[in-house]
């Protein structure tokens, strides 16, 4: 059956989006704790609404951090600094409700099942079981230099640029909340050939006209980010299509940690196990194993073993070894998927403690991931984005 040309769409949001405010607060608290206590257990959830922030969750640590102070500093950094924006770092109420991690969970994480049964084979790796059951996916493809799908890559770049021109006063009438969406057309071979549609919605000062916003965003945001060769006379632009976006941020919509999991990953291009990232320390496989799966997939593609690769990992609570590892190359693999799974097992330690050690995840590195995506980042140095295993994989595959 002949493949047809098709469209695929992904979206991103700015750091001022209500859900992203929550992700950044949760990860700022996590970073503050990890900077003083690398072995802390953190599961920190945030919700925001008009004039109110609630931080709740389970945190077990030997240190103290000033949560309200961290909350206010994070909100200020995003740009909610005036009451007329509907949300103000100085005047919003901050409520906290923090418990310790459940002793039942801690028991399984502190000493993994294999250690309790004397089956741990690697003495170097401390016995840490998975903090929960679950399945995680990692993905990579050769559509972009950073080995990410083009739609989410462009959507993130537009969202980041929207924030940039607001903060550097190029477009001083912009306010923090905003969303971007990019539709890419793929040819019969599944290769991206053009941008079909761009949607940008941005919060703004009440006195600016739609015509001004439309002109400025095309000039200072879209042209600055999207390669000219991807845009043609048929490309459609929808800039603030409702005509007005003054009420935004937590005043416009309540926000919650972990509600932008597709924005955080691959824009819907790959499957998702359902677990969110922000506010969780690395013993939570929702986060660490998703990072590891991306690391594996990216190295497979970087090694030339496939044009695209999706890796699934799955865990049982309290058990260190993954219960399953699978690799799907969508027919683009240079070797069989069975061979790839064997290569993955031989080159990557995918036990929770192995992942933490391999990717050095006990550091305060998480706030920078809480907006504009956790993968394909070129602006920050993230260990799971390295391709340092590619040469070994290629050699062992005999290519």
From Swiss-Prot:
InterPro entries: ADOMET_SYNTHASE_CS, S-AdoMet_synt_C, S-AdoMet_synt_central, S-AdoMet_synt_N, S-AdoMet_synthetase, S-AdoMet_synthetase_sfam
Binding site for ATP: 17, 177-179, 244-245, 253, 259-260, 276, 280
Residues holding K(+): 45
Segments for region (Flexible loop): 101-111
Protein's cellular compartments: Cytoplasm
Known function: Catalyzes the formation of S-adenosylmethionine (AdoMet) from methionine and ATP. The overall synthetic reaction is composed of two sequential steps, AdoMet formation and the subsequent tripolyphosphate hydrolysis which occurs prior to release of AdoMet from the enzyme.
Protein name: S-adenosylmethionine synthase
Taxonomy of the source species: Bacteria, Bacillati, Bacillota, Bacilli, Bacillales
